[in-house]
Amino acid sequence: AQNLKLQSSLLIPRFDVVRQVFQKAGGSGADYRYKYFLSSATFDFDGESYALYDRYQGQDSLYQQMIPMLRTSEMYMIATEVTEDLEEATDYLNTLRVNRGLREISSTQVEQSLEAEWLRELYGEGQLFFYYKRKMKTEIQSAYDPYGTKTINLLRYVLPIPDGETKYN
C-alpha cells in the first residue's frame, strides 16, 4: 500500500526543504497547509528524508489531478499585490494568514511575507512559475537546499511558440 501511495503522489520533496519553506511563516506546525498536506507521511531514502505531498489525494484519479483555476487565497494575494494602501494590503494578507492558522504580520513585513505566502499556497502545483515570471525573479527558493536559492536566467520565462501556432499564421 505504501508503494502504491508513492507512485500516485504528485510531489515527493525533501523534508528539510519543506520544513524550511513552512517555518518562514513563523512556526510550521500551525500552518494547516503543512500540517495536513505535508507533515503526516515521511519516508527515508538513500540517507535523505522525504515528505509525501497529499494535497489532492481523493476518491478517484480525476480528483487527484484537479488543480483549481482560481481560489479565494489567490484573490487575497493578488489584492495585496495591487493595492496602493499599505494598511489595506496588510489586512488582505492577514486575512489569508489567519485562515491558514498563522499569526498576523505588521505592514513592514508585507512584501517579504507575500512572496513566502505565494510559495506556500502554490507549493507543488507548478503555478509558482507564473508568479516568478510576473515578478521577473532571478533567484528562487532551491528545491534541494533548504537555505539555498537557484539562479534563473530571465530568458527561461519566455516560452517557445508552438509550431502549430506559426505554421498557418
Language-model segments: which ranges?
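Acidic/polar-rich alpha-helix caps and helix-coil junctions
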Residues: 1-13, 23-169
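A surface-exposed, glycine/aromatic-enriched loop/edge motif typical of exported proteins
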Residues: 18-19
